[in-house]
Amino acid sequence: MSWSPSLPTQTCGAWEMKERLGTGGFGNVIRWHNQATGEQIAIKQCRQELSPKNRNRWCLEIQIMRRLNHPNVVAARDVPEGMQNLAPNDLPLLAMEYCQGGDLRRYLNQFENCCGLREGAVLTLLSDIASALRYLHENRIIHRDLKPENIVLQQGEKRLIHKIIDLGYAKELDQGSLCTSFVGTLQYLAPELLEQQKYTVTVDYWSFGTLAFECITGFRPFLPNWQPVQWHSKVRQKSEVDIVVSEDLNGAVKFSSSLPFPNNLNSVLAERLEKWLQLMLMWHPRQRGTDPQYGPNGCFRALDDILNLKLVHVLNMVTGTVHTYPVTEDESLQSLKTRIQENTGILETDQELLQKAGLVLLPDKPATQCISDSKTNEGLTLDMDLVFLLDNSKINYETQITPRPPPESVSCILQEPKRNLSFFQLRKVWGQVWHSIQTLKEDCNRLQQGQRAAMMSLLRNNSCLSKMKNAMASTAQQLKAKLDFFKTSIQIDLEKYKEQTEFGITSDKLLLAWREMEQAVEQCGRENDVKHLVERMMALQTDIVDLQRSPMGRKQGGTLDDLEEQARELYRKLREKPRDQRTEGDSQEMVRLLLQAIQSFEKKVRVIYTQLSKTVVCKQKALELLPKVEEVVSLMNEDERTVVRLQEKRQKELWNLLKIACSKVRGPVSGSPDSMNVSRLSHPGQLMSQPSSACDSLPESDKKSEELVAEAHALCSRLESALQDTVKEQDRSFTTLDWSWLQMEDEERCSLEQACD
């Protein structure tokens, strides 16, 4: 459907006529706009010169459109009141929803699609058109004229939606009409329609297969520039599995059963769709669409299997090759790694699978964890969801990447750039050259993404290392504080012990134990280990900062972008040449751009792999440091527990020493009540019970002396009683503790047992 200039203004109430959208088999399609509500509709009106038979078929199309209801078939609308009166004849108007995206032909003609649509766009198109055809066939409707001009695009909530239009193909397929009205669209018609034979729904299979092939490759499958008669006689010679009949640059006709390159499909989709196209493009209608698994008309179910594939794309950073793996919902990551090992030779244990942000695929999640729906991006994104494969057994990544082999026609002009080609040959081969430069740029960008994913992974490991470094520093400080406290405490204890040995308690075993503690804590601390690790981590940090600051670590653009833009401009100028200027020409300028692009690609790849090797080396250092830091932290924690244990032991020994001292207090010492013979008294007040007559007979001075002695005895008695109560209370407290670990002298043990008795 081609866009036309605006028509003379015409209104019908709030409705205003806008531009002509296109011309169909029966008449014109015009856009109308409601100025009050903003609603837009497409009005299809018939030409006056229709034959009676086609007038009846026009009315039949309107009836069909009004009863259909499917998201991929354009919907009928009510004709606004009064608009029927504007019709040029008595035939009814057909009102339809307006799809602002234009038709598929307009989309295919965009320069970017010269070698086929993007993968996501191909999948959405196949899904939508297959769904629409299924619906029509279930309602016993055969479209018979499926082509890009009869598919329109509507922007949905998440993606573009494709809708089939123009169900009014009802021309009589006599020889005259075929050579006039259908010139340019014959290649979408099934052979049996051209041969005026009986047909079934399989005519739509041929049209759908031809349409799908063009969307994948950018050109029609069978001699697109040949006239109908010669076309028919040559194409019918193809085998049942041939899906391409083309001319090379020398004019030789070639038949092939393979999907041609270039296209934008991954290897798995290309292989599966190649087999599906072989079903759809069979020359004989009885065999067409028959699937080996699903039988006759099983092509739609076979396509469902393809569209429902879940694919994981793995970019091997060692070779630069993308491997695509179909996976099931419950397939484990380990299973995927086994398949990767079979394809790449990289051992499962050495495989590191990174996502774009540098995240490692989780082993406890299924292989589908890295898949997003490629059909929701409308094919606009240039990059598939890639998983980047690194080989952990490698430190130095050598540049092994070479550009993809060019298509056959591009190889020819590389060998003979001065060779003159026809305009149609130039248009095709120049489009392929431009696509080849685009591919070089995209391959370079993917390798750059892989290097950046490795860099992000390094930064994540470095972040973990930094946290562990901080934990190590904190643990080291805590340990140092406890060591300093312990060393200071035991030094003071040793000094005080030495001071009291002349008149106090002595114990060689206790002194030896303290000396051993002092030596034991000297082995704690790990200061040298911590210092060495910090130095290595600081050196690694410097290397990482240098990597981030390096221009090589940033996105590589520049020359390849410029060359791709120059090639696009050359191709655009060729496409837009007026018809009278479409003459032969050579490809020297295009070849020059392609050769420069190849050189630029190889240079950028060397830069990327130099950066990747440095990144891998830094990551290896970080991975080596992580367990060493963990080990040192673990040893420091053990040292801390040792210091705490020694501190507890020393404190228990001090308390035991105090117990021994207290036990000695209960023995005869200078100034004790026993030295004053207080213990021989039956009662502390015995001295006070002497007869008063004896006291009276003493002189006055003797009486005073006797009173002082009695008072002293009383005080001593009370002191002895208080001391005994205190010792008993201490005994009850001490005996609740376990002192079995402390070895005591026999004499001291006996003394303690007597005191307890």
From Swiss-Prot:
- Tissue note: Detected in heart (at protein level). Expressed in liver, kidney and spleen.
Q: Which UniProt keywords apply?
A: ATP-binding, Cytoplasm, Hydroxylation, Isopeptide bond, Kinase, Membrane, Nucleotide-binding, Nucleus, Phosphoprotein, S-nitrosylation, Serine/threonine-protein kinase, Transferase, Ubl conjugation
Tell me if rRNA-binding is a UniProt keyword of this record. no
Residue(s) carrying Hydroxyproline: 191
Cite a single GO BP annotation. Answer: canonical NF-kappaB signal transduction
Q: Which PANTHER family match?
A: IKB KINASE, INHIBITOR OF NUCLEAR FACTOR KAPPA-B KINASE SUBUNIT BETA
* Name under which the protein is recorded: Inhibitor of nuclear factor kappa-B kinase subunit beta
What is the source species? Mus musculus
Gene symbol? Ikbkb
